[in-house]
């Protein structure tokens, strides 16, 4: 509360800041013979936004929300002129010059339909936008699918990277409010496609008003209600049980222009994959074999099972999602207000290993995520050229994962029932309860051929939950002083983070105490929080500890294990000078980062409290607030009306991924104990990550309806996190902490060079085309903070060698083409028919051919090299590359008008040719089809000899054909998604 009150106080004291939701109109009004018309009025139709021209006929209209408008210029004695289809983009200037014709009759008017701008003369960096029309026509109906088409953007294993960056170096906003997942990277919200006015990608080089993003910003801007009521109802259905119902409505309500979109989606399989059906029939008689089960793979247990897998229908992967996106704009002349509200609630079932879980799908995990965002912005014009603005936003994200059989628990005691055989029997069935070895000991799996298949009723998940809150406050001013747009602002953000996990082993121990200990009278007693025996057991078996919760799942706000509350405060000043032949955008930004982590008072002697399973808190203090100064400079040179050059230099800074340094005191005790390998340790007093970037580019409109953009860039990022030892820690330090305990430290870097090419056309003979190509060379020491775990382990207390190599998440070559073909309104039966084709290609990502032994792995897992400590590179790191990937998406739609109502029928196909794209490979073989285990005698000979054809048959079907061992180890797949067909209809009014 103390921090919150400080933020609110600052909010009312300071008058600086800006949110990225609007652009501006700028131009001149002159007569047809070129004479400047002073005092002409320029109005954005349907709004109170407008300006009068100065003595040179020039005007500027600030703070125009992104979208499409009609703009009218009027002057006494001249025909009023209206230009429609005027597109305003966030943070860019829309040039609009009017030439008015003299009029002998009062009230004469001229209407002009504006054309799509192909060159942004005011942009001093690379900005790629997708407007509402392009979003609606696209063959991929997802924000991610549209981002994947943009130059500089790479999506590898579900994570988005911009210009060779790590995923955590990309920021995301929605209607100017931050929606970045600062804990685990990525974005928390994807807006409803029909609610979007535009999506924009800024690949670095932005002005001083943008922070917290070293490599790029992805902006989603919601639509504003129009001057008339209108709406749309849309329904689609498709493969894998997919349904989608979306409705939008917007228009005026008195002084309010509102817009709302509601979307409800359902799918039976939210993660479709290339699975292959199989039956285990070792004797080849055409009948599925009855296979004897063995206790832990050794002793017959008297049970038999049939292994028959249907790869076309995977159980327990249902997902349901409900979204609401709303905006409301109120215009009171010099004062206007915009409100944004977002709700995004999802529930989904998980089944990452459908073959191993085929007999126990009822007990697989289910998860729930609830997200709300509220934002408000107040703008006040002191005069047409002086704008004050203030904004407030808050976002809350809660997540919970639980047992699918029992459902969401109301508390600790409910979760204990998951590990109680009587509760399993009464909730599932008697047979499932009877499978348990004791009332508190879960059953062993069916082992056939050394492959474990879970028995019905076995527990599969613990109880986990986390909660994150983001609070943002900003205020600002914009002053248009002639050709100078001067902006200054203050931006404050605070985050609150809590996480909790109750493991199945802890559940088992508490249930054991209830069943066998005189010190625990009942489940009520166990869940009371006051039973010391239970509290001690939880402390022993929940070694990871909690942040912001106690071990019983109650919120906890005190001490070192309370919630983490990192924050940032930023101040900037920026001057954008726009004259006819040059644009100069220069500014400086100062960021202060408070990580809310700790620092050790004596790094050579960590305060490890061995006896109390924690730390000596007096040996730690709050980390210092870090300050970063970031100058920015961008220039644009419109050499001709068709050619613009731009240059950019800038420094950028951000906090590290916050999930990495945070650890409970109990987990710190575990790491310093040194008995266990802990690949995800903690960090202390970490510094910001900083980037320096240079960019030069040219935009050239080589035809009246076509333009290209070529941009070259280079950047260097320092201070990225990596695993390291505290080399100053001695073997005989006073508290006895392990000298080879790992830590997250600043010390990594990335160097990226590349260029981007884009082609964009207006509609030419029904066809509109967009194409992009990116070449990049991204190198560094590590691709992620844990990449050097093997090196660190093998080099013990000496620093591992620093070798620069290609980063595994990058594509050296990446391209995309979108072709949108539409028949016009006067082409008979074909009127309203349209097609959209997307083609995406990339050259794969780097990997390293490696060898090594099996390590501590079960026979059914093979010898995958998941643990970096057991990998032995057979070539320079990152020397090999996965195969090229190709994706084709196609959409066809037909629109007709029935009595003023628009009806559209549509169908679209993702991965049109059902291409089995290889997105990852086995490190040992370098391909996605054979892991080299069965073919390598030194790895598998003894196992195969002891278990025969059944083992081989299972290994080939479970692992090689269906990648269960790879999913188990890496949590991802070797192949991209299969073909998905969707179709539906929409009605617009």
Q: Where in the sequence are the language-model features?
A:
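Periplasm-facing N-terminal accessory domains of Gram-negative outer-membrane beta-barrel systems
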Residues: 18-109, 113
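Short loop/turn motifs that connect adjacent beta-strands in outer-membrane beta-barrel proteins
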Residues: 208-210, 225-230, 254-255, 333-334, ...
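Transmembrane beta-barrel wall of Gram-negative outer-membrane proteins
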Residues: 239-350, 366-389, 631
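C-terminal beta-signal and adjacent terminal beta-strands/loops
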Residues: 273, 826-868, 883-887, 895-989
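Signature of Gram-negative outer-membrane beta-barrel scaffolds
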Residues: 311, 315, 460, 487-642, ...
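Membrane-embedded beta-barrel scaffold of Gram-negative outer-membrane proteins
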Residues: 646, 650, 656, 660, ...
């Amino acid at each position: 509360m103390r921090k919150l009150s400080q933020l609110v106080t600052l909010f009312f004291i300071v008058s600086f800041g800006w949110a990225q939701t609007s652009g501006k109109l700028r131009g001149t009004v002159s007569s047809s013979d070129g004479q400047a018309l002073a005092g002409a009025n320029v109005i954005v139709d349907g709004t109170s936004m407008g300006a009068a021209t100065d003595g040179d006929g020039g005007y500027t209209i600030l703070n125009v929300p992104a979208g499409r408008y009609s703009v009218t210029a009027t002057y006494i004695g001249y025909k009023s002129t209206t230009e429609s289809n005027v597109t305003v983009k966030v943070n860019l200037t829309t040039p609009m010059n009017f030439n008015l014709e003299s009029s002998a009759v009062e009230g004469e008017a001229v209407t002009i339909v504006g054309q799509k701008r192909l060159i942004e003369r005011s942009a001093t960096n690379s900005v790629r936008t997708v407007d509402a029309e392009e979003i609606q026509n696209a063959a991929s109906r997802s924000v991610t699918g549209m981002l994947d088409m943009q130059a500089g953007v790479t999506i590898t294993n579900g994570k988005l990277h911009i210009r060779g960056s790590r995923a955590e170096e990309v920021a995301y906003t929605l209607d100017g409010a931050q929606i970045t997942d600062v804990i685990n990277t990525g974005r928390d919200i994807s807006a409803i496609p029909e609610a979007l006015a535009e999506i924009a990608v800024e690949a670095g080089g932005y002005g001083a008003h943008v922070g917290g993003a070293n490599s790029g910003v992805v902006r989603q801007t919601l639509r504003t209600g129009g001057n008339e009521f209108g709406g749309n109802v849309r329904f689609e259905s498709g493969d894998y049980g997919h349904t989608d119902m979306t409705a939008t409505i917007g228009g005026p309500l008195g002084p309010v222009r509102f817009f709302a979109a509601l979307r409800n989606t359902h799918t039976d399989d939210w993660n479709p994959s290339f699975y292959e059906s199989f039956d285990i029939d070792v004797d080849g008689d055409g009948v599925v074999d009855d296979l004897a089960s063995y206790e832990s793979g050794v002793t017959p247990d008297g049970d038999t099972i049939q292994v028959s897998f249907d790869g076309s229908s995977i159980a327990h992967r249902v997902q349901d999602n409900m979204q609401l996106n709303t905006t409301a704009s109120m215009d009171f002349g010099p004062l206007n207000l915009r409100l944004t509200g977002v709700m995004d609630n999802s529930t989904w079932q998980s089944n990452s290993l459908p073959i191993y879980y085929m007999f126990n799908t009822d007990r697989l995990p289910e998860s729930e995520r609830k997200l709300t965002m509220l934002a408000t912005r107040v703008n006040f014009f002191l005069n047409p050229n002086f704008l004050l603005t203030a904004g407030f936003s808050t976002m809350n994200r809660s997540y919970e994962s639980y047992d699918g059989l029992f459902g969401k628990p109301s508390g600790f005691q409910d979760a204990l029932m998951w590990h109680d055989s009587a509760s399993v029997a009464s909730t599932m069935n008697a047979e499932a309860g009877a499978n348990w070895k004791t009332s508190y000991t879960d059953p062993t799996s069916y082992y056939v051929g050394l492959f474990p298949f879970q028995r019905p009723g076995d527990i599969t998940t613990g109880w986990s939950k986390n909660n994150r809150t983001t609070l943002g406050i900003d205020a600002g001013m914009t002053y248009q002083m002639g050709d100078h747009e001067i902006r200054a602002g203050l931006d404050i953000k605070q985050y609150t983070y809590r996480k909790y996990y109750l493991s199945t082993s802890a559940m088992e121990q508490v249930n054991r105490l209830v069943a066998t200990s005189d010190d625990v009278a009942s489940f009520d007693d166990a869940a009371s929080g006051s039973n010391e025996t239970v509290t001690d057991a939880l402390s022993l078996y929940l070694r990871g500890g909690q942040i912001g919760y106690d071990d019983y799942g109650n919120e906890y706000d005190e001490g070192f294990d309370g919630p983490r509350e990192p924050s940032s405060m930023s101040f900037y000043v920026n001057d954008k000078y726009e004259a006819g032949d040059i644009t100069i955008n220069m500014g400086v930004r100062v960021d202060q980062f408070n990580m809310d982590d700790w620092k050790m008072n004596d790094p050579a002697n960590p305060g490890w409290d061995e006896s109390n399973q924690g730390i000596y808190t007096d040996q730690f203090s709050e980390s210092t607030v870090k300050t970063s100064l970031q100058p920015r400079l961008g220039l644009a040179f419109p050499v001709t009306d068709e050619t613009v050059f731009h240059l950019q230099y800038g420094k950028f800074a951000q906090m590290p991924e916050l999930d990495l340094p945070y650890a409970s005191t109990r987990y710190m005790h575990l790491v310093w104990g040194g008995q266990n390998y802990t690949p995800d340790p903690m960090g202390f007093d970490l510094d910001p990550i900083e980037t320096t970037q240079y960019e030069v580019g040219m935009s050239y409109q080589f035809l009246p309806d076509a333009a290209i953009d070529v941009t070259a860039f280079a950047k260097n990022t320092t201070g990225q996190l990596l695993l390291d030892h505290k080399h100053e820690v001695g073997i005989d330090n006073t508290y006895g902490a392990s000298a080879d305990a790992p830590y997250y430290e600043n010390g990594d870097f990335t160097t990226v060079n590349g260029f981007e090419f884009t082609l964009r056309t207006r509609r030419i003979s029904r066809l509109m085309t967009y194409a992009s190509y990116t070449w990049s060379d991204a190198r560094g020491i590590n691709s992620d903070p844990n990449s050097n775990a093997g090196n660190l382990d093998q080099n013990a207390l000496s620093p591992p060698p620093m070798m620069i190599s290609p980063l595994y998440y990058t594509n050296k070559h990446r391209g995309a083409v979108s072709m949108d073909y539409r028949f016009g309104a006067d082409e008979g039966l074909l009127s309203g028919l349209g097609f959209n084709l997307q083609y995406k290609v990339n050259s794969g990502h780097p990997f390293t051919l490696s060898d090594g032994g099996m390590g501590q792995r079960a026979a059914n897992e093979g010898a995958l090299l998941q643990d970096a400590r057991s990998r032995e590179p057979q070539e320079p790191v990152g020397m090999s590359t996965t195969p090229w990937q190709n994706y084709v998406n196609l959409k066809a739609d037909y629109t007709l008008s029935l009595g003023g109502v628009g009806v559209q029928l549509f169908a679209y196909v993702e991965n049109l040719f059902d291409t089995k794209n290889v997105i990852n490979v086995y490190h040992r073989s370098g391909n996605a089809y054979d892991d080299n285990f069965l073919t390598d005698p030194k790895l598998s000979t003894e196992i195969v000899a002891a278990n025969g054809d059944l083992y081989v048959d299972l290994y080939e079907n479970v692992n090689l054909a269906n990648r269960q061992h790879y999913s188990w180890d890496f949590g991802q797949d070797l192949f991209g998604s299969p073909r998905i067909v969707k179709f539906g209809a929409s009605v617009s009014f």
